[in-house]
Amino acid sequence: MKVIKVSAIIDALIKDGWYLDKHESTSHRQFKHPTKKGKVTINGKLSDDRSGFLLKSIERQSGLKF
């Protein structure tokens, strides 16, 4: 099973053109893309790991593979 840090996921999203749309006082961040439909929601601290269904959900929302 692949394990990846939240910070690495965010770096990959930004490199692909996604930008931070919402980040309030919660641990959830929402990213939007200028041409792709939908939003990508990422929860957790930057140092947290993501794997399994959470990573699959982020891949589905963004169209990226990690």
Residue ranges: model-predicted function:
Residues 1-23, 27, 31-66:
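Basic nucleic-acid-binding interfaces
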